[in-house]
Amino acid sequence: MSVKWTSVILLIQLSFYFSSGSCGKVLVWAAEYSHWMNMKTILEELVQRGHEVTALASSASILFDPNNSSALKIEVFPTSLPKPEFENIVTQEIKRWIELPKDTFWLYFSQMQEIMWKFGDIFRNFCKDVVSNKKLMKKLQESRFDVVFADPIFPCSELLAELFNIPLVYSLRFTPGYVFEKHCGGFLFPPSYVPVVMSELSDQMTFMERVKNMIYMLYFDFCFQIYDMKKWDQFYTEVLGRHTTLSEIMGKADIWLIRNSWNFQFPHPLLPNVDFIGGLLCKPAKPLPKEMEEFVQSSGENGVVVFTLGSMITNMKEERANVIASALAQIPQKVLWRFDGNKPDTLGVNTRLYKWIPQNDLLGHPKTKAFITHGGANGIYEAIYHGVPMVGIPLFADQPDNIAHMKTRGAAVQLDFDTMSSTDLVNALKTVINDPLYKENVMKLSRIQRDQPVKPLDRAVFWIEFVMRHKGAKHLRPAAHDLTWFQYHSFDVIGFLLACVATVIFIIMKCCLFCFWKFARKGKKGKSD
């Protein structure tokens, strides 16, 4: 047989192998904003590898347009909440979160709690709209999906996985106080050296900082999400027709893919069914648009500064915009500022405003000297990947923590958005640009980020395919999920051992008393004789 025909037969065999054995069907409970950006990167790679991906999204979803052509299949389910109203709620609640008073612990977190409860009610209604839609549920059941993929910060996917009896893979950045990670995933975060997320602490804590960390942990564990989780418990119990809890159903997840990495996160124990996939969006820079490239090149040896506060921040107050613009006008670098609003009066000739910028491509440009960021995880990972020091102006959620982590690593300077002056911003930029330590530190983080045997995206895809191939990954799931809280902490064993010790001590004491009584009685009898 000729080499030509041998090659043809081998290709045919390979095509049969990949078409029949390797391609799976993935059901996705869609997320919003940056959560969806990360998930979409994984899903597009799955499609490239021949898998069929169906994203389940509500008619109110902000990022989904069913008319847009996409490799992903979009299954839109109707909901009573109109899209413009949902978008307005998100905008208003995020604005409210940003403006919360940060100087009072109880006031800040109690109001943040109300915001989370409001979103919880909305997403619970979305979930009700899905499971009550018999036609849709029948269609999904008949599709015979191999795995459900979701971000657990938007609950419901675990209910679908339970109803359809299929494996579940999570992709998560964090939940406030690590509540879902600990209560549902069984993660370990010893408060003695692992700072609670949103505490802005490092892993090198003083005694009083450990006290603060413990207070944060107790608050998040016993107060923050309890009310909302009980609502989910009740809803899941009604749907499944048996008593259950959100923690129990979420705890059945086969794999947790955490969008973090060890050059970003402080070290802590990990379970076998947990893997880090931080930096999914990091990639080599592409050429800039012609007009933008010309502006960057015009900066000469001074280089450029990239500035963005993210896609969720619009209509910045005029006073704050002018303070920032005034500061940027005082530096020798050219500035590319992602800004959606009226042009500030103090805008300098060295600054250009854009409604959108190719952030990754700009950060990867050799003339970029610094990155002014709100501290979103995606932006920080891109800055680390390309080795760009940062000036952090965190606004809400995990952003203060993210910047605090970079500050601890010596890769960033942190400012307060509400109180910073033009001088503060100028000095911060001069520090990260002119002090070589910041560049050295972020380059060290960059080398660590790039020095991985398997890329984060490939690891994420591997685990999803692994779960599809093996119909789950229960062999990696710790038995801790099957224990009650007192069994998990061995309180029953400790109680039993204490009871045994107490019994032995009691018997010894009784024997001693009996012997003492015997000897005392014998002594009295001898004296009387």
Swiss-Prot record:
Catalytic activity from the UniProt record: glucuronate acceptor + UDP-alpha-D-glucuronate = acceptor beta-D-glucuronoside + UDP + H(+)
One Pfam entry name: UDPGT
Positions of glycan attachment: N67, N68
GO cellular component, one term: endoplasmic reticulum membrane
Tissues expressing the protein: Expressed in several tissues, including the prostate, mammary gland, epididymis, testis and ovary.
Enzyme class, first EC level, given as a word: transferase
Membrane-spanning residues: 494-514
Signal peptide: 1-24
Major location category of this protein: membrane
CDD domains given in the database record: GT1_Gtf-like
Keywords, alphabetical: Endoplasmic reticulum, Glycoprotein, Glycosyltransferase, Membrane, Microsome, Signal, Transferase, Transmembrane, Transmembrane helix
Keyword presence, Glycosyltransferase: yes
The protein's Enzyme Commission number: 2.4.1.17
Topology in the lipid bilayer: Single-pass membrane protein
Molecular function via GO: glucuronosyltransferase activity
Annotated compartments: Microsome membrane; Endoplasmic reticulum membrane
Task performed by this protein: UDPGTs are of major importance in the conjugation and subsequent elimination of potentially toxic xenobiotics and endogenous compounds. This isozyme has glucuronidating capacity on 6 steroids and the bile acid, hyodeoxycholic acid. May potentially play an important role in estrogen and androgen catabolism in peripheral steroid target tissues.
Record family assignment: Belongs to the UDP-glycosyltransferase family.
PANTHER family: EG:EG0003.4 PROTEIN-RELATED, UDP-GLUCURONOSYLTRANSFERASE 2B33
Protein name (database record): UDP-glucuronosyltransferase 2B23
Organism, scientific name: Macaca fascicularis (Crab-eating macaque)
Source taxonomy: Eukaryota, Metazoa, Chordata, Craniata, Vertebrata
